[in-house]
Amino acid sequence: MDHLSNLPDELLCHIMSFLTTKEAALISVLSKRWRNLIAFVPNLDIFDCDILHWEVRKEERDDIRQLFMDFVDRVLALQGNSPLKKFSLCCGGGSYSDRVDCWIQNVMVRGVSELDLSMIFDTSYHMYPQVFENKKLNFEIFLRALPALEELVMNHIYWKELDVNVHVSVSSASLKTLTIKCIVCLHTKSFDTPSLAYLSYSDYAMGDYPVAKMENLFEARISLFVPEDDISRLMNSIRNVRYLYFSRDTLEVLSLCCESMPVFKNLKSLSIKSVESRGWQAMPVLLRNCPHLETLVLEALLHHVTDKCGDACACVSREEKGRSLKSCPVKVLEIKEFQGTMKEMHMIKHFLDYLPCLKEMKISYMKKNDHTTQFRVIPQVIAEMVEHYNKLSNCNVQLVVSG
């Protein structure tokens, strides 16, 4: 012990950092100098199993738990505000929850850089929220620290700055796959992702997209809500995409940027979700701006009838009806969620009449439950009309029944 006593304080603290806190506390009783040094140990490893033995009676365990909590309180009080690198805590039992919160706050205030917690509680425990905050790290710095990142998922993120217009930039030269779903409290968003190949973007439309670089995009699934903002800059950034999906809300948001809609020169497959409460205002210009489109997938045909969708569908009778379809090079048309209404049948006939390159049409029909039989038989008129279309057209029309 005399040899150890001759060592400098810094070296003794380093040696003590390899001991558990219980072992360091036991050594500290050897002398006043050792007791003072424990205040500067940079690592704390605290385990209740060092003190609590489960074979003892419950009454004794409760007393020992109190001793354990008092021990941790004394160690933290002895250390005061000294810097701390690592804090490891392993404990169990619901009686610790309030005290644990104070311990975590203590080490967080002291700037702990590594927190190792293993805790079991009888009831739910909400951890001190500042554990998950880092005031020195922002999102852009975080991405720059990941130069080889290829996939990023941002799912239901709530930005802290609720009272300001927050701008977030997804900037990564290596990123290939990006999934974004519901990022709350943002005003603008930028994409600087030149290597991005796949984008799944489901969120509220932003007020602006100051930077939007995705020139190598291969596939995109876009689902944007609230038709109040012009997303033309975002659309222009994905103009090189080959496979594209638009949700029902996105199609209506696109109606705000029809005049600035880019030409999707590489697009081969376009999928669009439709619903009766949303219009097709953007459909005519969208089809005209896909000069090499081969496959068109319409998930449902019924939509809200407006004056501006008339030349893409059979909803409105006018002389220029079908004008946007006549230049559309689509060869394969898939119609999903077909309900068998006469309105849908008229639209199918409309596509057969005005899509000049159409070679194959696949109609998916789901059987519905019936009150008298297990399934309702497909109305004979639908089968007859499909057969009639096959005779009058060069297009192969298929009715696929499922359910």
Curated annotation (Swiss-Prot):
Coiled coil: none
Stated name of the protein: Putative F-box/LRR-repeat protein At5g38386
Entry keyword Repeat: yes
Domain F-box, residue spans: 1-47
Pfam families per UniProt: F-box
Gene3D superfamilies: 1.20.1280.50, Ribonuclease Inhibitor (3.80.10.10)
Cited InterPro entries: F-box-like_dom_sf, F-box_AtFBL13-like, F-box_dom, FBD, FBL60-like, LRR_dom_sf
PROSITE patterns in the record: FBOX
Protein keywords: Leucine-rich repeat, Repeat
SUPFAM superfamilies: F-box domain (SSF81383), RNI-like (SSF52047)
